[in-house]
Amino acid sequence: VVLMVGIDSVVGLLAGTVLALLYFVENFSKGHFDITRNRGNQFIDRLYEGDFEKFSDSVDVVVYSFKGSLTYVNGETHKDRIHEKINMFNTIILRMRELGHMDHDGLEILYEIIEELEHEKKQVYITGVTEDMKILMLKNDKSHLITEKMVLENTTSALREIGFII
């Protein structure tokens, strides 16, 4: 009887751990974000993950805020989302302020996003980059894609650079 209780509880713990891990990976792979929309020097609104389907092209500048981490697991989701919905605008600000972690695969995805946007003649700014992220960016062989003018301290600076009166 003691052996059966021990085996059953171990199986239950393993099954629970596997289910929790699957839930975590599924949630993590979605790539958390929010989008701030601006038109004619004015803030329009902020869309969160659940509101993404309400997105329209009635704005001039889009601020795409990465949240959490940017890694291999969720990088493609961010890239696809930007390609599908954000790509229609001329000016895109990639806000990294709430990005807690970015690995080398996440950096590669970031460079792919920038390459794709610049190839389509979009004006791209990157804001909120930490010192650790800057070091990671400068050590990469694609660091030539990011110029000093593109990387600004905060989103307000980027909006001023574009011509917004803030």
Feature locations, PLM:
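The feature marks cytosolic C-terminal regulatory regions of anion transporters and related permeases
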Residues: 1-144, 163-166
